[in-house]
Amino acid sequence: MLSYQDTYYSDNEKCQNYMQDTEIHGTIDFVCGAGDVWFEGCKIVTEKRTLDGSGINIITATRTSDTPWGYIFNRCTIENNVSMFNYGRSWHTSPRCVWLNTTLLTPEKLEATRFDDEGMKISSNYFKEYHTTDAQGHDITPKTNKVTFTLRDHSQPFVAETIMTREETKQYTVKRIFGNWRPDKILKKLEKQSEKLKKQYIK
């Protein structure tokens, strides 16, 4: 998926979506919306906002309201083609966004706060990160990252720790979030069927 802003927009307060091995390109708030959405093994690419590549890119803008989990990125890779970027910012309601086991191809270009500290309509959020690595597989997750989130006018200060503990990550499983609907298992079944058809018809 390739666009500038709002490349992927989950415009449903109660949606439950699952994406795997998808490539998403954009510049600002290009993965945005509500609901519970699991991104598995996806490639996230930040494109240039300006011709000279200046400016800061923001990947997500969540507005979680009627669901408990929000956006979950697991085993995703971030390719950055700009000067600086961050994981995301709060939109409104009760934004939630978690990055698990992320690979950063240009970790030196991730903002120090890691998430945008200025929300659009609300400052409070649940923004978390766990086990982030560089392209060589080295764990580059800071031991702690407390951020003071505010609105653009610096009102509503909200201090939060954005680094998760291993114990906290245990609640994030496809089974727990989606219940009896197991999109991960459905995809595995389809992949096996596809391989079977290839062997049968492509010689």
Where are these regions (language model features)?
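Sequence-level preference for short, compositionally simple segments enriched
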Residues: M1-K203
